Amino acid sequence: RALANNSVAYKGKPEMGTFMREWLSLYDSKSGERGIFNRDAADKQVARNERRETGHMWGTNPCSEIILRPYQFCNLSEVVVRDYDTLEDLKEKVHFATILGTLQSTLTDFKYLRKIWKTNTEEERVLGVSLTGIMDHHVLSKNVYSARWLEEMKRVAVDTNWDLATNGRGITQSAAITCVKASGTVSQLV
Protein backbone atom coordinates (compact mmCIF):
# COMPACT_ATOMS: atom_id res chain seq x y z
CA ARG A 1 0.00 0.00 0.00
CA ALA A 2 2.85 2.41 0.69
CA LEU A 3 3.70 2.60 -3.02
CA ALA A 4 0.14 2.64 -4.36
CA ASN A 5 0.35 6.20 -5.74
CA ASN A 6 -2.53 7.47 -3.59
CA SER A 7 -3.17 10.99 -2.36
CA VAL A 8 -5.37 12.62 0.22
CA ALA A 9 -7.61 15.35 -1.24
CA TYR A 10 -8.52 18.38 0.86
CA LYS A 11 -11.34 20.72 -0.16
CA GLY A 12 -9.54 23.64 1.44
CA LYS A 13 -6.49 24.44 3.51
CA PRO A 14 -6.10 21.83 6.28
CA GLU A 15 -5.43 22.90 9.85
CA MET A 16 -1.74 23.10 10.74
CA GLY A 17 -1.83 20.00 12.97
CA THR A 18 -3.54 17.95 10.27
CA PHE A 19 -1.05 19.13 7.67
CA MET A 20 1.94 18.34 9.89
CA ARG A 21 0.62 14.81 10.55
CA GLU A 22 0.28 14.32 6.79
CA TRP A 23 3.79 15.67 6.24
CA LEU A 24 5.25 13.40 8.93
CA SER A 25 3.45 10.40 7.43
CA LEU A 26 4.88 11.32 4.02
CA TYR A 27 8.37 11.56 5.52
CA ASP A 28 8.04 8.31 7.47
CA SER A 29 6.94 6.41 4.36
CA LYS A 30 10.35 7.01 2.71
CA SER A 31 8.46 6.63 -0.57
CA GLY A 32 6.82 9.98 -1.29
CA GLU A 33 3.44 8.43 -0.50
CA ARG A 34 0.81 9.45 0.16
CA GLY A 35 0.51 12.68 -1.75
CA ILE A 36 -1.34 15.79 -0.52
CA PHE A 37 -3.81 17.40 -2.94
CA ASN A 38 -5.81 20.60 -2.38
CA ARG A 39 -8.95 20.94 -4.53
CA ASP A 40 -9.24 24.68 -3.81
CA ALA A 41 -5.67 25.27 -5.03
CA ALA A 42 -6.44 23.20 -8.14
CA ASP A 43 -9.49 25.36 -8.88
CA LYS A 44 -7.33 28.51 -8.63
CA GLN A 45 -4.73 26.97 -10.96
CA VAL A 46 -7.41 26.00 -13.50
CA ALA A 47 -8.72 29.59 -13.51
CA ARG A 48 -5.29 30.98 -14.49
CA ASN A 49 -5.47 30.20 -18.22
CA GLU A 50 -9.14 31.30 -18.46
CA ARG A 51 -9.99 28.42 -20.84
CA ARG A 52 -11.45 26.01 -18.30
CA GLU A 53 -14.64 26.15 -16.28
CA THR A 54 -13.94 26.35 -12.54
CA GLY A 55 -15.92 24.83 -9.69
CA HIS A 56 -15.48 21.13 -10.45
CA MET A 57 -14.46 18.57 -7.83
CA TRP A 58 -10.94 18.43 -9.28
CA GLY A 59 -8.58 15.49 -9.15
CA THR A 60 -5.52 14.51 -11.13
CA ASN A 61 -4.02 11.71 -13.15
CA PRO A 62 -1.90 9.26 -11.10
CA CYS A 63 1.30 11.34 -11.19
CA SER A 64 -0.64 14.56 -10.41
CA GLU A 65 0.78 16.69 -13.21
CA ILE A 66 -2.57 17.09 -14.97
CA ILE A 67 -5.63 18.56 -13.22
CA LEU A 68 -8.76 16.67 -14.28
CA ARG A 69 -12.50 16.85 -13.78
CA PRO A 70 -14.16 13.81 -12.27
CA TYR A 71 -14.59 11.12 -14.95
CA GLN A 72 -11.96 12.53 -17.29
CA PHE A 73 -8.65 11.43 -18.74
CA CYS A 74 -5.94 13.27 -20.64
CA ASN A 75 -3.65 12.59 -23.56
CA LEU A 76 0.04 12.63 -22.77
CA SER A 77 2.80 12.92 -25.34
CA GLU A 78 6.46 13.07 -24.45
CA VAL A 79 9.31 15.11 -25.92
CA VAL A 80 12.76 13.63 -25.38
CA VAL A 81 15.14 16.47 -24.54
CA ARG A 82 18.77 15.83 -25.50
CA ASP A 83 21.56 17.87 -23.94
CA TYR A 84 22.55 19.25 -27.37
CA ASP A 85 19.01 20.31 -28.46
CA THR A 86 18.66 23.95 -29.47
CA LEU A 87 15.51 25.93 -28.77
CA GLU A 88 14.49 25.45 -32.41
CA ASP A 89 15.02 21.67 -32.11
CA LEU A 90 12.81 21.55 -29.04
CA LYS A 91 10.11 23.72 -30.58
CA GLU A 92 9.97 21.35 -33.55
CA LYS A 93 9.69 18.34 -31.23
CA VAL A 94 6.93 20.08 -29.24
CA HIS A 95 5.12 20.88 -32.50
CA PHE A 96 5.05 17.22 -33.56
CA ALA A 97 4.21 15.95 -30.07
CA THR A 98 1.28 18.39 -29.99
CA ILE A 99 0.01 17.16 -33.35
CA LEU A 100 0.20 13.58 -32.11
CA GLY A 101 -1.53 14.42 -28.82
CA THR A 102 -4.24 16.49 -30.49
CA LEU A 103 -5.09 13.72 -32.93
CA GLN A 104 -4.95 11.20 -30.10
CA SER A 105 -7.45 13.33 -28.15
CA THR A 106 -10.14 12.31 -30.66
CA LEU A 107 -9.86 8.67 -29.58
CA THR A 108 -12.50 8.69 -26.85
CA ASP A 109 -14.84 5.88 -27.87
CA PHE A 110 -14.09 3.32 -25.18
CA LYS A 111 -17.01 0.91 -24.93
CA TYR A 112 -16.19 -0.07 -21.34
CA LEU A 113 -16.39 3.48 -19.90
CA ARG A 114 -19.57 5.32 -19.01
CA LYS A 115 -20.70 8.10 -21.37
CA ILE A 116 -19.71 10.82 -18.86
CA TRP A 117 -16.02 9.91 -19.39
CA LYS A 118 -16.36 10.49 -23.13
CA THR A 119 -18.36 13.72 -22.62
CA ASN A 120 -15.94 15.30 -20.13
CA THR A 121 -12.86 14.26 -22.07
CA GLU A 122 -14.21 15.56 -25.39
CA GLU A 123 -15.33 18.88 -23.86
CA GLU A 124 -11.85 19.77 -22.63
CA ARG A 125 -9.47 17.54 -24.64
CA VAL A 126 -6.79 18.09 -21.98
CA LEU A 127 -3.38 17.57 -23.54
CA GLY A 128 -0.09 17.04 -21.74
CA VAL A 129 3.00 17.70 -23.85
CA SER A 130 5.75 16.82 -21.43
CA LEU A 131 9.52 17.18 -21.54
CA THR A 132 11.74 14.28 -20.49
CA GLY A 133 15.39 14.99 -19.78
CA ILE A 134 15.25 18.66 -18.81
CA MET A 135 17.71 18.19 -15.96
CA ASP A 136 20.36 16.95 -18.42
CA HIS A 137 19.94 19.94 -20.73
CA HIS A 138 22.48 22.77 -20.69
CA VAL A 139 19.77 25.49 -20.65
CA LEU A 140 16.61 23.93 -19.22
CA SER A 141 18.41 22.75 -16.09
CA LYS A 142 19.45 26.33 -15.29
CA ASN A 143 17.40 29.29 -14.09
CA VAL A 144 18.87 31.79 -16.55
CA TYR A 145 16.92 31.20 -19.78
CA SER A 146 14.81 28.15 -18.94
CA ALA A 147 11.62 30.12 -18.18
CA ARG A 148 11.79 31.87 -21.57
CA TRP A 149 12.45 28.59 -23.39
CA LEU A 150 9.56 26.86 -21.58
CA GLU A 151 7.25 29.76 -22.39
CA GLU A 152 8.22 29.64 -26.07
CA MET A 153 7.64 25.88 -26.21
CA LYS A 154 4.28 26.31 -24.49
CA ARG A 155 3.32 28.90 -27.13
CA VAL A 156 4.24 26.41 -29.89
CA ALA A 157 2.03 23.75 -28.26
CA VAL A 158 -0.94 26.10 -27.83
CA ASP A 159 -0.60 27.52 -31.36
CA THR A 160 -0.22 24.08 -32.96
CA ASN A 161 -3.28 22.79 -31.14
CA TRP A 162 -5.22 25.92 -32.14
CA ASP A 163 -4.24 25.48 -35.80
CA LEU A 164 -5.48 21.87 -35.77
CA ALA A 165 -8.69 22.88 -34.01
CA THR A 166 -9.54 25.64 -36.48
CA ASN A 167 -8.80 23.94 -39.79
CA GLY A 168 -12.10 22.11 -40.22
CA ARG A 169 -11.11 18.73 -38.78
CA GLY A 170 -13.83 18.91 -36.11
CA ILE A 171 -11.35 18.83 -33.23
CA THR A 172 -12.08 21.13 -30.30
CA GLN A 173 -9.17 23.20 -28.96
CA SER A 174 -7.69 21.76 -25.78
CA ALA A 175 -8.71 23.59 -22.62
CA ALA A 176 -5.28 22.98 -21.10
CA ILE A 177 -1.97 22.07 -22.72
CA THR A 178 1.57 21.26 -21.55
CA CYS A 179 3.01 19.94 -18.36
CA VAL A 180 6.28 19.08 -16.76
CA LYS A 181 6.07 15.76 -15.03
CA ALA A 182 8.33 13.45 -13.16
CA SER A 183 9.74 11.21 -15.87
CA GLY A 184 12.72 9.72 -14.10
CA THR A 185 12.14 6.19 -15.34
CA VAL A 186 11.37 7.28 -18.90
CA SER A 187 14.39 9.56 -19.06
CA GLN A 188 16.60 6.64 -18.01
CA LEU A 189 15.25 4.55 -20.90
CA VAL A 190 15.71 7.18 -23.60
Q: What kind of feature is each model-predicted range?
A:
Residues 1-14, 107-118, 122, 133-182:
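Internal maturation/activation junctions in enzymes
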Residues 28-141:
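Function-dense linear segments that define catalytic or interfacial modules
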Residues 19-22, 72, 93, 126-133, ...:
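General structural feature for long, well-ordered alpha-helical segments within catalytic domains
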Residues 33, 71-73, 172-175, 183-185:
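Active-site lining segments that contact anionic ligands and/or coordinate catalytic metals
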Residues 19-21, 60, 170-173:
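Short solvent-exposed loop/turn micro-motifs enriched in small/polar/acidic residues
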Residues 26, 175-190:
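Active-site and channel-lining beta-strand-loop segments
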Residues 1-39:
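Polar, glycine-rich mid-to-C-terminal structural blocks
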